[in-house]
Design a protein with these regions (language model features):
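Acidic, glycine-enriched catalytic cores built around paired aspartates
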Residues: 1-286
Length: 286
């Protein structure tokens, strides 16, 4: 997760609609009367200030896909990513959804169903089917992760897991259906994105290794040497230098751990990245 998933959209995609709109959609989906649209006061934690009513379109900053009164905001774009891919994907999915809705509505009308009745029936069916994606709570909470799993929502925790779905047949069908991207174009983009990820992680690994070997380890060894001399001097002057020796041993264990970690990192960054682009990216991730 970027920034630990606590300062960025969570990996589980959900849609925030707000209490008022969610109540209306649930009423349509399940044939119930919608609750009133009165807003609750904001909980600002200051008793001397008057109650401030919450705007019905008050934003949920933890939602990756939020309705903010007159528009939806898609917030799951990576900081280094171009917005084009997200826009292409969203528009392709929207085109397919509208095409499906139009086909279902035309089929109902062809059977003689009145327009308003067909629309109401279709809306109720679609809203009920897609209610699992609607969530107005805290998208960062562990409770939401458990609830999302119950709802059957995917939780793609890393880049490689997400890019692996580029080649899914149903995903490629969405882009191919309206001539946006062919399967071959989808696979080529998947290959490029996986290679970019692998190279980025490899560069980061080699950089960390160089910093550890040339900047951190020499300082740690110099400090260890100073402690060794101090402990040796203390032992020569007094009978009880156990504390100095114990501290030296603690630092030495940390330095040994650093050296071992650097050796492990070196073996990893110089290891075999062979195989498919997906396998190489998975190796880099792991």
């Amino acid at each position: 997760h970027r920034l630990g998933a606590n300062e960025a959209p969570p990996a589980v995609l959900s849609v925030y609609l707000g209490d008022s709109l969610s109540a209306i959609i649930r009423a349509i989906a399940y044939g119930k009367e919608a609750a009133g649209g009165c807003s609750e006061p904001l909980q600002i934690g200051v008793s001397v200030l008057p109650n401030i009513p919450r705007d019905l379109s008050d934003r949920n900053r933890t939602s990756p896909f939020a309705f903010t009164g007159n528009k939806f905001e898609f917030r799951a774009l990576g900081s280094s990513q171009n917005i084009a891919t997200a826009n292409i994907s969203l528009n392709a999915a929207m085109a397919c959804a509208l095409d499906d809705i139009a086909s279902m509505l035309e089929a109902e009308l062809a059977q003689g169903t009145p327009l308003n009745a067909a629309i109401q029936s279709l809306l109720a069916k679609l809203f009920a089917e897609h209610m699992p994606i609607v969530f107005d709570g805290n998208g960062y909470s562990d409770e939401w992760l458990a609830e999302a799993e119950k709802r059957g929502l995917p939780n793609l925790k890393d880049t490689v897991a997400a890019l692996a779905h580029y080649s899914d047949k149903d995903v490629m069908a969405v882009f191919e259906r309206h001539g946006v991207l062919s399967p071959r174009e989808m696979l080529s983009r998947q290959e490029i994105l996986l290679e970019n990820y692998t190279h980025s992680v490899s560069i980061e690994g080699h950089t960390a290794l160089k910093l550890g070997r040339t900047r951190i380890l020499p300082v740690a060894l110099a400090y260890q040497t100073r402690l060794a001399k101090a402990a040796s001097s203390a032992a020569a002057l007094v009978d009880d230098a156990a504390e100095e020796k114990a501290y030296f041993v603690r630092v030495r264990e940390q330095v040994r751990g650093l050296m071992s970690a650097l050796d492990t990192l070196e073996a990893a960054v110089n290891g075999d990245f062979g195989g498919t682009a997906l396998a190489r990216a998975a190796y880099a991730r792991d």
